[in-house]
């Protein structure tokens, strides 16, 4: 089972340069730890500093090598030609394979702030993804109808490798869409182990219906790997007790190296091939230490 990293993009900082520096340091730590992939997220109209995906990933790739990297795009909030152009440039900067993570997105505030009707998300998503795929294959694209009409659109540079698409989804219709349209489904960080098993079964059934074979089966987890049990008690347990992101505590992966390895091994036994981790603590030194120890977790899982 591979372990990648999705870097936290939002920071409550007095100096906005500190948040960007924290992301660079975390990417460097993930590279040094030998993690298998690097990703950043996508959100808009935020009260706290949120470092936007295309720009920050371009910087983070300087810390990365030929291992896969990518970014999440909430497709209903973007014009597909613009996304395809961003992907083409990022894929040219990356030394390895570029992965597009995408999702419908949520939150009335960001949709209202971007002037997009949240009720139109599914149709906008499917139309955008189709155009992005075609552009990233090097096609000239004309679309007469729908939410994104374009005439004679093309991009350069085109990604040097075929674009791999992971679709994040939670509701049954969205999981079916991920099976129908994606190369992989990305399971969410809010899922408890029992929910993760149930949704994986739904996804497998949908893949069978649509005659699709996924390239991988990734799941997102929010984690903290402590050096000792006292470290876990000091840094992670207060965050969990405070109701981290409104998640069920069973969805969070917290413990020492051996404990976290055991928790993640369960997902491999279910059939997940990749775990994409994000640090649940804000303290930068603690997060960097946890990232380094995720590398130790990875080694334990590889040796098992």
Whereabouts are the PLM-identified features?
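N-terminal beta1-alpha1-beta2 module of alpha/beta enzyme domains
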Residues: 1-64, 68, 163, 292
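Hydrophobic faces of well-ordered beta-strands that scaffold small-molecule active sites
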Residues: 3-7, 38-40, 68-71, 98-102, ...
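Active-site mouth loops of central-metabolism enzymes
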Residues: 6-21, 71-80, 159-170, 246-258
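Active-site-adjacent beta->alpha loops and helix N-cap segments on the catalytic face
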Residues: 49-56, 191-206, 283-289
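Internal, glycine-rich beta/alpha segment that forms the wall or movable "lid"
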Residues: 79-181, 194-206, 210, 214-215, ...
